[in-house]
Amino acid sequence: MKMANPKYKRILIKLSGEALAGERGVGIDIQTVQTIAKEIQEVHSLGIEIALVIGGGNLWRGEPAAEAGMDRVQADYTGMLGTVMNALVMADSLQQVGVDTRVQTAIAMQQVAEPYVRGRALRHLEKGRIVIFGAGIGSPYFSTDTTAALRAAEIEADAILMAKNGVDGVYNADPKKDKTAVKFEELTHRDVINKGLRIMDSTASTLSMDNDIDLVVFNMNQPGNIKRVVFGENIGTTVSNNIEEKE
């Protein structure tokens, strides 16, 4: 089948840490990472410029640790290191399927990754390399969703692809608990904020809205879905400033 022109030419894919854990839900499952890497490689081979942000929830969660008595700042820094571990594993899997990949971190660790430098990240993308951003934004209290929105704005990405485990979009209620839940095909960023739809945290949603970055929430467990989103197929939920607000 002949493919149309891509809707998005430069994307930032946001993966949860749990996406790397496979069925176990914790830790890192190498076969799962390799499967995701092949999906990304297929899209990259079509000339799409790709950056990644990966959460760290498969290895560590700062908020529960803080609630249990750990200093919140230290707990968040620990989580940032978890995102770097995930980034290094994903980078290795992408390298193994033939994709030149760089990891850039917001906390200096020169032995394993480049420091985050916007201009260098842009050059990597222009040269056909994938860039994975690790260690959040380098400061506590900010989520990896906010990292994704910030880095997407900085690299002038056309869209953030929120790749979800077994969730095929945004609903007005939890579809696992409410059989009458209705999926939204389209939303504005303001819809998301006003309705309290927790796709991303409010900081990330506002950043995406202010910088006019589309957000697509889709099920990553269906093979080929990343490509479908990039080429504009109507899957998942698209959040954009260029959509009429829902009542």
From Swiss-Prot:
Q: What is this protein called?
A: Uridylate kinase
The enzyme class is: transferase
Instruction: Provide the residue positions that the database annotates as binding ATP.
Output: K14, L15, S16, G17, G57, R61, N165, Y171, D174
Q: Which residues bind UMP?
A: G56, D76, I137, G138, S139, P140, Y141, F142, S143, T144
What Pfam families does this protein's entry cite?
Answer: AA_kinase (PF00696)
Q: Which Gene3D superfamilies match?
A: Acetylglutamate kinase-like
How is it regulated at the activity level? Allosterically activated by GTP. Inhibited by UTP, 5-bromo-UTP and 5-iodo-UTP.
Q: Which domain of life is it from?
A: Bacteria
Q: Which HAMAP family match?
A: PyrH_B
Quote the function comment for this protein.
Catalyzes the reversible phosphorylation of UMP to UDP, with ATP as the most efficient phosphate donor.
GO BP field: 'de novo' CTP biosynthetic process; UDP biosynthetic process
| Recorded family membership | Belongs to the UMP kinase family.
Note whether Iron occurs among the keywords: no
Cross-referenced PANTHER family: URIDYLATE KINASE (PTHR42833), URIDYLATE KINASE PUMPKIN, CHLOROPLASTIC (PTHR42833:SF4)
Q: Which organism is it from?
A: Streptococcus pneumoniae serotype 4 (strain ATCC BAA-334 / TIGR4)
| Enzyme Commission (EC) number | 2.7.4.22
Subunit organization: Homohexamer.
Name the Gene Ontology molecular function terms of this record: ATP binding; UMP kinase activity
Q: Which InterPro entries match?
A: AceGlu_kinase-like_sf, Asp/Glu/Uridylate_kinase, Uridylate_kinase, Uridylate_kinase_bac
Q: What's an example GO cellular component term for this entry?
A: cytoplasm
**This protein's pathway:** Pyrimidine metabolism; CTP biosynthesis via de novo pathway; UDP from UMP (UMPK route): step 1/1
UniProt keyword annotations, A-Z = Allosteric enzyme, ATP-binding, Cytoplasm, Kinase, Nucleotide-binding, Pyrimidine biosynthesis, Transferase
The record's annotation in NCBIfam families points to: pyrH_bact
Q: What reaction does this catalyse?
A: UMP + ATP = UDP + ADP
Q: Segment Involved in allosteric activation by GTP: which positions?
A: 22-27
How does activity track with pH? Answer: Optimum pH is below 6.5 at low ATP concentrations and is 7.4-7.8 at high ATP concentrations.
